[in-house]
């Protein structure tokens, strides 16, 4: 595969952009090789600057549930742009979008739009601390909630890729208010509550997507809700990745556990910079200008991003079999990958919910970040490189999640499985030839 233009682009980018990328995982640091510089996408496929075609399971890290260059979204954007790019004033579309999110998800009474998942979780934490008049928070090792200082502690993919638990530049005076519990371990959460009597909230990805794909156990989520009530702490469920990905009602719908506050992003923006946080009205009404908790943004509720979000949600609403179709494809993919690996006695753990999936080169089921870290990342890197050379674009880290889009079909999935089986065969042959 010729990737000369990507090599040249990457070298040029590194001269003016730190690491050559604007988000670290894109640099292929954990899998090796040269990141592909993408020129365009259509449906299930992306094309690099050398015009190589790839089946794309990254889908912009989750937002593109209908695939690349969706015509309905493109049309909505084209119309919106003609009316102006940004006003810094309220628009009817903002209210319409928020109503759609609330009605479809059933997860909040009121909601505010922001520009990124990091903004959403950061704002939700500030609000929870103000509401409870407490300072400490509990998060889970391996869960990623953006790069705000309070949450950049044991943060999964963004840090796990580089083997560091946090980041330089994050003051201890801030992180001392963050307690870290073990995912799927309710007793570790209780221990955090016993350690601090000043816990404002617990924040969690019910479907963890940044330690690889690791779903929470249903009983764990139910016990977590009860524990938050017992200790008078708010429960924040981070649906930035899983919202409208795992199903119409996201992870909250799968677990039947109500959050006090919830965050959204990715799908609700349809590929544009858009996120949201919401929850009970009595909590949300503490936000300025109604209450005293300050939160603001020049481009919050940007009409172009809102138009893309509306076009996405209205398509979801009009397609009642969407999530069933996506999950059928996801299950077909992970079943095929596991069987392909087994045929060469390569251990592979797989799982999916809705259109989210993941796999680990691991001997045992992965239930938390400790389990995930025991995975064979060298094997993942070899697999990733070889699949990329065969035109399959998986997430470039063992500690990330994959995504199915509606533009995919059984033929595409079967093609990927066939290529994976060939790759497992190549890897096995290479290993045996060295013995």
Curated annotation (Swiss-Prot):
<keyword id="KW-0663">Pyridoxal phosphate</keyword>
<comment type="subunit">
    <text>Homodimer.</text>
</comment>
<dbReference type="Pfam" id="PF00202">
    <property type="entry name" value="Aminotran_3"/>
</dbReference>
<dbReference type="InterPro" id="IPR015421">
    <property type="entry name" value="PyrdxlP-dep_Trfase_major"/>
</dbReference>
<dbReference type="InterPro" id="IPR015424">
    <property type="entry name" value="PyrdxlP-dep_Trfase"/>
</dbReference>
<keyword id="KW-0413">Isomerase</keyword>
<dbReference type="GO" id="GO:0030170">
    <property type="term" value="F:pyridoxal phosphate binding"/>
</dbReference>
<feature type="modified residue" description="N6-(pyridoxal phosphate)lysine">
    <location>
        <position position="266"/>
    </location>
</feature>
<keyword id="KW-0627">Porphyrin biosynthesis</keyword>
<dbReference type="GO" id="GO:0005737">
    <property type="term" value="C:cytoplasm"/>
</dbReference>
<dbReference type="InterPro" id="IPR049704">
    <property type="entry name" value="Aminotrans_3_PPA_site"/>
</dbReference>
<dbReference type="GO" id="GO:0006782">
    <property type="term" value="P:protoporphyrinogen IX biosynthetic process"/>
</dbReference>
<dbReference type="InterPro" id="IPR015422">
    <property type="entry name" value="PyrdxlP-dep_Trfase_small"/>
</dbReference>
<comment type="pathway">
    <text>Porphyrin-containing compound metabolism; protoporphyrin-IX biosynthesis; 5-aminolevulinate from L-glutamyl-tRNA(Glu): step 2/2.</text>
</comment>
<protein>
    <recommendedName>
        <fullName>Glutamate-1-semialdehyde 2,1-aminomutase</fullName>
        <ecNumber>5.4.3.8</ecNumber>
    </recommendedName>
</protein>
<comment type="similarity">
    <text>Belongs to the class-III pyridoxal-phosphate-dependent aminotransferase family. HemL subfamily.</text>
</comment>
<dbReference type="GO" id="GO:0008483">
    <property type="term" value="F:transaminase activity"/>
</dbReference>
<dbReference type="InterPro" id="IPR005814">
    <property type="entry name" value="Aminotrans_3"/>
</dbReference>
<dbReference type="InterPro" id="IPR004639">
    <property type="entry name" value="4pyrrol_synth_GluAld_NH2Trfase"/>
</dbReference>
<dbReference type="GO" id="GO:0042286">
    <property type="term" value="F:glutamate-1-semialdehyde 2,1-aminomutase activity"/>
</dbReference>
<keyword id="KW-0963">Cytoplasm</keyword>
